[in-house]
């Protein structure tokens, strides 16, 4: 007997849960941070590839002069991903120690983690503006 239905349910029929969403974004932020570390190492190695530093300075001048808004946005997004990944990592460490394992506490710790990540990212962005002198003391 042949039944016209899938063997296993597809992901689209499930309602997204807070815990699964946080898990997916934790993996995405980890992959993004690993990519940013790789590209930053490659960026700093560009100066070693040329015989003179003229091309490196020319490239760096292009980035800072023409793509300043892009670099600032990328740094802020990377800081947001780092704060989220770090806060969720602390949450996972607390789970490993046996804390917050009840379902209601899992959701509560997820919301607290999200607010901590947003607060840390906001503090980093404010500190970045202060160090550039855009906000007077």
Curated annotation (Swiss-Prot):
Keywords: Electron transport, Heme, Iron, Membrane, Metal-binding, Mitochondrion, Mitochondrion inner membrane, Transmembrane, Transmembrane helix, Transport, Tricarboxylic acid cycle. Pfam families: Sdh_cyt. One of its GO terms (biological process) is tricarboxylic acid cycle. The keyword Transmembrane helix applies. Its main location: mitochondrion. Its cofactor is heme. Pathway: Carbohydrate metabolism; tricarboxylic acid cycle. The keyword rRNA-binding does not apply. It is found in: Mitochondrion inner membrane. GO terms for molecular function: electron transfer activity; metal ion binding. The chain crosses the membrane at residues 31-51, 60-80, 106-126. It is a multi-pass membrane protein. Membrane-anchoring subunit of succinate dehydrogenase (SDH) that is involved in complex II of the mitochondrial electron transport chain and is responsible for transferring electrons from succinate to ubiquinone (coenzyme Q). Forms part of complex II containing four subunits: a 70 kDa flavoprotein (FP), a 27 kDa iron-sulfur protein (IP), a cytochrome B and a membrane-anchoring protein. This is Succinate dehydrogenase cytochrome b560 subunit. It comes from Marchantia polymorpha.
């Amino acid at each position: 007997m042949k039944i016209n239905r899938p063997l296993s349910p597809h992901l689209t029929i499930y309602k997204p849960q807070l815990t699964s969403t946080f898990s997916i974004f934790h993996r995405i932020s980890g992959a993004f941070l690993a990519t940013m570390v790789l590209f930053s190492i490659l960026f700093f190695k560009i100066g070693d590839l040329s015989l003179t530093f003229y091309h490196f300075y020319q490239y760096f001048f292009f980035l800072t002069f023409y793509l300043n808004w892009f670099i600032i946005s990328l740094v802020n997004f990377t800081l947001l991903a780092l704060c989220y990944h770090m806060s969720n990592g602390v949450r996972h460490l607390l789970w490993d120690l046996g804390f917050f394992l009840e379902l209601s506490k899992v959701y509560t710790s997820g919301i607290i983690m999200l607010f901590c990540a947003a607060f840390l990212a906001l503090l980093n962005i404010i500190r970045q503006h202060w160090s550039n002198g855009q906000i007077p003391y």
